[in-house]
Amino acid sequence: MLVTRGDRGGGERAPSRRPRCGLVPAGAAALLAGASCLCYGRSLRGEFVHDDVWAIVNNPDVRPGTPLRWAIFANDFWGKGLADSTSHKSYRPLCVLSFRLNIFLTGMNPFYFHAVNVILHCLVTLVLMYTCDKTVFKNRGLAFVTALLFAVHPVHTEAVAGIVGRADVLACLLFLLAFLSYQRSLDQGCAGQCFPTTASPFFLLLSLFLGTCAMLVKETGITVFGVCLVYDLFSPSHKQDKLSNGAVCQHSSGQPGSPQPSSQQAHPHRESRKQRFPHKDSWGGCHSPLPPEPKSSGFPMSPRAMWSLMRCLTGSTNRNFLLTLRPFLKRAILVISYVTVILYFRLWIMGGTMPLFSEQDNPASFSPYILTRFLTYSYLLAFNVWLLLAPITLCYDWQVGSIPLVETIWDVRNLATILLAVVMALLSLHCVAAFKRLEHKEVLAGLLFLVFPFIPASNLFFRVGFVVAERVLYMPSMGYCILFVHGLSKLCAGLSRCGATSLMASTVLLLLLFSWKTVKQNEIWLSRESLFRSGVQTLPHNAKVHYNYANFLKDQGRNKEAIYHYRTALKLYPRHASALNNLGTLTKDMAEAKMYYQKALQLHPQHNRALFNLGNLLKSQEKTEEAIMLLKESIKYGPDFADAYSSLASLLAEQERFKEAEDIYQAGIKNCPDSSDLHNNYAVFLVDSGFPEKAVAHYQQAIQLSPSHHVAVVNLGRLYRSLGENSKAEEWYRRALKVARTAEVLSPLGALYYNTGRHKEALEVYREAVSLQPSQRELRLALAQVLAVMGQTKEAEKITSHIVSEEPRCLECYRLLSAIHSKQEHHGKALEAIEKALQLKPKDPKVISELFFTKGNQLREQNLLDKAFESYEAAVTLDPDQAQAWMNMGGIRHIQGSYVSARAYYERALKLVPDSKLLKENLAKLDRLERRLQEVRERDQT
């Protein structure tokens, strides 16, 4: 720990005696980078959690496979159009582009997303040290401690470990670079100017560019312009000359009213070589001699400083003051004009509207009482400062009951607000009193870096969508770190050596505690489960964290636990419409589910998902018209909700209202062009409607939008199979296996192999499918069927018999057993299996017809021809198009010598299958027999 310690007498240090830190810049940078990596190294193992899912995984502007479109500059951070009424209006296109670059270079691997965040945090830490060294402390040791405190502070965990926190981290980096560029643009060598001229327009323009980039990464980046201007105003870079009778400021030659330079200002260029950044001067030097300044009186503003300020702002010398202020005014006019333009652009691209938030997001802003809003907003400022001072309780979400409203002036929490107000007032007075002394710029810089970046989150100018958000403290924490280290150095200077050593040891301990806390917080951000569970443990009175944890549990299929946390959320916040809606989806009792949906709609009549769920429930109850109305309402209030379009269109198609279904699908694709599910469902509809060519295009679009959409890939394979393009079908099935090697994908591939005679490959595929889902009856039955065809009848019989023991009413099992026994020439067992199948009394006449036909075959094999004929007769009675049964009946009559009857049956079968060679051969045989009989009769007659 390197803290400089001034002379205890409080004397002013000479510029030439600037203390230096023993650390070389490279060593300090290595230590800071190492500390940052040690604290956040564990976050590299994290997955996409919380807002990452919506900003990256589900964001159409970020998703891999989607083309890079100009719409990225018209959409918000989550991929919605900024003009959309449901948009959060968070315009961060450069941050979104950084996500796209991540995906382009390394794919959707979260490791590299986290790695970029950690690297950016390291860079911010290093640039902060450089900034503090060159413009704030002019002391490398203090700058190092400031940056080290910033590097390990636990409140940064959300910004660094959460991938969407990149907006804050990258904006902070650009914020610092813009500030440094602004300082670099000032003339550091104008020895007598109260306000330096703009020496480098390039760096001034670069500052504007970097500040704009910071704003396009996150909105708070725009506050750098305010920091630059106020810092420029209150820390002028002229060189102060302290004379016994006052101070004189040198103006440029030829300027009216310019005093002559004093003897102490004879070597301005020598001084300018010593310091690149602002030099020491005062506004007091711009005027006539001032009264001698007495020794420090303990009052924050000395009489000399106050006299200087009064003379600057009033009196007969205002003309000279304005002349000295001219360089600053030029810069200020440029910056303010530029900020006005980009703010106008920002409002224009939002459609001139502000985001709409709910009471859950920011309860205080919905209070009807001005006093409640004022007291709560004020207390939240103190609460945020407390998070910086003592980051003990940290949580990813502070909404809905985390911080109760401050509704009365007698609330004890107002003491924290008053204390903060007093401290900020004293610090502000200190800045005003010491604005003419270089050694007191630390407090000014600390306050500016603390206050300005927090203004957009303060509810001062507009309502924000959160109560407290730890990641928005990433930028303001720079100011806190500067003030903390400055106060530490002042304390150290006023203590004895022993006291200073104890203070430094305490600081080291604090840094170690902060580091440990940061490492532990990183573990929380590793997965959705650990994050959401930590919220419940940290803020059990927060309804939102219970709701989020319940959502996670529902996704994991842990429904009982999910129901418990949904109900807990409702106890804490009974007006939580989404919790009621989700609770309804988990309830098995349809009446209870309907009650939950209706309650949700009473609280929020435009809740599109509750409308959707209630509509589907009524659809299942065959209340078609009510369901259609609710689904249309769901689309009305959620035009980007793709599931509602699919559900409504499928319902209309079931009602044979195909034109309306087509229109709904078209509207859905127009409003949700990036929904792969919607394209897939529309393709299924087109196949059923007889437009397979159009369906191919939508299947391919679904796959392009989501290459991992294995359902669309399999459906496309099935479509090609139905079109007879088996090679293409096999290609798509194999592609689906690369995405998801599941039984659902293996099954159609096995069927393709079986139906094309590739039985060995079919057997391998079905064996793998059964190993993945051994309990699925259809797969085991298909495997048994392949085994039977390949002659492995014993194994086939074993599998089929096992299925029958589990499901005695398995009709297909009995049919397969009959085929297996027939192949084994156990016709009695085959007949017995068919009899059992007939006893199940299937409803489909064609199925019964096939069973009678099979029974007839087994009877015929046992030479029970009359009974076989009866079975065939029963088959054709149920299904007159059963050509094989007609032919077999003809064959029996043929064998029995009833040739006339046989011919009738053969001819009936031939009408059904006119190209049957077997029938023609049988008829030819019958003709020959009849001719022989005729010849025999003729010979007998002769």
Curated annotation (Swiss-Prot):
<feature type="transmembrane region" description="Helical">
    <location>
        <begin position="160"/>
        <end position="180"/>
    </location>
</feature>
<dbReference type="GO" id="GO:0006396">
    <property type="term" value="P:RNA processing"/>
</dbReference>
<feature type="transmembrane region" description="Helical">
    <location>
        <begin position="21"/>
        <end position="41"/>
    </location>
</feature>
<dbReference type="GO" id="GO:0005783">
    <property type="term" value="C:endoplasmic reticulum"/>
</dbReference>
<feature type="topological domain" description="Cytoplasmic">
    <location>
        <begin position="131"/>
        <end position="140"/>
    </location>
</feature>
<keyword id="KW-0677">Repeat</keyword>
<dbReference type="InterPro" id="IPR019734">
    <property type="entry name" value="TPR_rpt"/>
</dbReference>
<keyword id="KW-0472">Membrane</keyword>
<dbReference type="Pfam" id="PF13414">
    <property type="entry name" value="TPR_11"/>
</dbReference>
<feature type="transmembrane region" description="Helical">
    <location>
        <begin position="442"/>
        <end position="462"/>
    </location>
</feature>
<dbReference type="Pfam" id="PF13424">
    <property type="entry name" value="TPR_12"/>
</dbReference>
<comment type="similarity">
    <text>Belongs to the TMTC family.</text>
</comment>
<dbReference type="Pfam" id="PF14559">
    <property type="entry name" value="TPR_19"/>
</dbReference>
<dbReference type="Pfam" id="PF13432">
    <property type="entry name" value="TPR_16"/>
</dbReference>
<protein>
    <recommendedName>
        <fullName>Protein O-mannosyl-transferase TMTC1</fullName>
        <ecNumber>2.4.1.109</ecNumber>
    </recommendedName>
</protein>
<feature type="repeat" description="TPR 6">
    <location>
        <begin position="710"/>
        <end position="742"/>
    </location>
</feature>
<comment type="function">
    <text>Transfers mannosyl residues to the hydroxyl group of serine or threonine residues. The 4 members of the TMTC family are O-mannosyl-transferases dedicated primarily to the cadherin superfamily, each member seems to have a distinct role in decorating the cadherin domains with O-linked mannose glycans at specific regions. Also acts as O-mannosyl-transferase on other proteins such as PDIA3.</text>
</comment>
<dbReference type="InterPro" id="IPR052943">
    <property type="entry name" value="TMTC_O-mannosyl-trnsfr"/>
</dbReference>
<feature type="transmembrane region" description="Helical">
    <location>
        <begin position="110"/>
        <end position="130"/>
    </location>
</feature>
<feature type="repeat" description="TPR 11">
    <location>
        <begin position="883"/>
        <end position="916"/>
    </location>
</feature>
<feature type="repeat" description="TPR 7">
    <location>
        <begin position="743"/>
        <end position="776"/>
    </location>
</feature>
<dbReference type="GO" id="GO:0004169">
    <property type="term" value="F:dolichyl-phosphate-mannose-protein mannosyltransferase activity"/>
</dbReference>
<dbReference type="InterPro" id="IPR011990">
    <property type="entry name" value="TPR-like_helical_dom_sf"/>
</dbReference>
<dbReference type="InterPro" id="IPR003107">
    <property type="entry name" value="HAT"/>
</dbReference>
<keyword id="KW-0802">TPR repeat</keyword>
<keyword id="KW-1133">Transmembrane helix</keyword>
<keyword id="KW-0808">Transferase</keyword>
<feature type="topological domain" description="Extracellular">
    <location>
        <begin position="218"/>
        <end position="331"/>
    </location>
</feature>
<feature type="transmembrane region" description="Helical">
    <location>
        <begin position="374"/>
        <end position="394"/>
    </location>
</feature>
<feature type="topological domain" description="Extracellular">
    <location>
        <begin position="395"/>
        <end position="414"/>
    </location>
</feature>
<dbReference type="GO" id="GO:0035269">
    <property type="term" value="P:protein O-linked mannosylation"/>
</dbReference>
<feature type="repeat" description="TPR 4">
    <location>
        <begin position="642"/>
        <end position="675"/>
    </location>
</feature>
<feature type="compositionally biased region" description="Low complexity">
    <location>
        <begin position="250"/>
        <end position="266"/>
    </location>
</feature>
<feature type="transmembrane region" description="Helical">
    <location>
        <begin position="141"/>
        <end position="157"/>
    </location>
</feature>
<feature type="topological domain" description="Cytoplasmic">
    <location>
        <begin position="181"/>
        <end position="196"/>
    </location>
</feature>
<feature type="topological domain" description="Extracellular">
    <location>
        <begin position="520"/>
        <end position="942"/>
    </location>
</feature>
<keyword id="KW-0812">Transmembrane</keyword>
<feature type="transmembrane region" description="Helical">
    <location>
        <begin position="415"/>
        <end position="435"/>
    </location>
</feature>
<dbReference type="InterPro" id="IPR013618">
    <property type="entry name" value="TMTC_DUF1736"/>
</dbReference>
<feature type="repeat" description="TPR 3">
    <location>
        <begin position="608"/>
        <end position="641"/>
    </location>
</feature>
<feature type="transmembrane region" description="Helical">
    <location>
        <begin position="197"/>
        <end position="217"/>
    </location>
</feature>
<feature type="region of interest" description="Disordered">
    <location>
        <begin position="245"/>
        <end position="285"/>
    </location>
</feature>
